[in-house]
């Protein structure tokens, strides 16, 4: 009888804990997007096989594709300070990569080749002619691979702060595979993700990695990255 009572108590506590974490996750989700900073009047959607891809199109002239860094908090909003200037001489396409920003975030394993396929397909089906590309951070690696795969799709390529080859040469280790499995867990994994991508961690990212002078960052930029994550 005592054993049965312990099982019932454990079951009730587990259920209550799960419900509490679930509602906490919902609260964090709602709080992150309440300012709606990623809304865009120029919204367009490219329906790809793995999900809908959000992009904007501005200006006239030779085509130019802007690709943001590959971070969970990244989005096409990274280019907001220069895309209007570029649009004076180019037709500027700004993407939110699959799994980022306003694009779909399917529960799949994201690989370099997945993004190679996305970029090549987008240029062929949406832009339709050789395109100049500006890529930030990790995105530069799969742009180079995409160019090697389909060279006729590309004009000039510019990479901003490309990731060094030593980092690109790494493969997933036991720790990263374990973390991936943890994040993929329902409810608990979502809470872990929210912890890793909390606003304080986004602020730290801006301070230590994104700005030479951290005082130049704006609260709105931090909020936009937090919303994207």
Positions of PLM-derived features:
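Conserved HGGG/HGGXW glycine-rich cap/lid loop of the alpha/beta-hydrolase fold
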Residues: 57-102
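Conserved catalytic-core motifs of eukaryotic protein kinase domains, centered on the activation segment
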Residues: 76-78, 103-109, 168-171
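Conserved alpha/beta-hydrolase catalytic His-Asp/Glu region
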Residues: 169, 194-229
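Conserved hydrolase catalytic core segment
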Residues: 128-172
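A catalytic-pocket lid/entrance helix-loop region that shapes and gates access to the active site
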Residues: 169-188
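A short loop-to-beta-strand scaffold at the N-terminal edge of the catalytic core in hydrolase folds
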Residues: 47-58
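Hydrophobic alpha-helical topogenic segments used for membrane insertion/localization
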Residues: 2-27
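Active-site loop/oxyanion-hole signature of alpha/beta-hydrolase fold enzymes
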Residues: 94-134
């Amino acid at each position: 009888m005592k054993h049965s009572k312990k099982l019932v108590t454990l079951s009730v506590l587990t259920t209550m804990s799960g419900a509490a974490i679930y509602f906490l996750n919902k609260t964090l989700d709602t709080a992150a997007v309440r300012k709606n900073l990623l809304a865009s009047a120029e919204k367009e959607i490219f329906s790809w096989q793995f999900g809908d891809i959000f992009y904007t199109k501005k200006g006239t002239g030779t085509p130019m594709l802007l690709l943001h860094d590959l971070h969970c908090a990244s989005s096409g909003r990274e280019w907001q300070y220069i895309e209007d200037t570029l649009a004076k001489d180019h037709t500027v396409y700004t993407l939110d990569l699959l799994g980022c920003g306003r694009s779909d975030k399917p529960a799949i394993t994201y690989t370099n080749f997945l993004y190679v396929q996305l970029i090549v397909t987008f240029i062929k089906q949406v832009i339709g002619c050789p395109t100049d590309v500006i890529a930030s951070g990790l995105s530069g690696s799969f742009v180079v691979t995409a160019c090697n795969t389909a060279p006729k799709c590309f004009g000039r390529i510019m990479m901003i702060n490309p990731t060094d080859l030593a980092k690109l040469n790494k493969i997933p280790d036991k720790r990263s595979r374990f973390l991936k499995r943890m994040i993929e867990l329902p409810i608990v994994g979502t809470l872990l993700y929210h912890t890793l991508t909390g606003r304080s961690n986004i602020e730290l990212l801006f301070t230590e990695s994104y700005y030479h002078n951290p005082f130049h960052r704006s609260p709105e930029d931090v909020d936009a990255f937090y919303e994207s994550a």
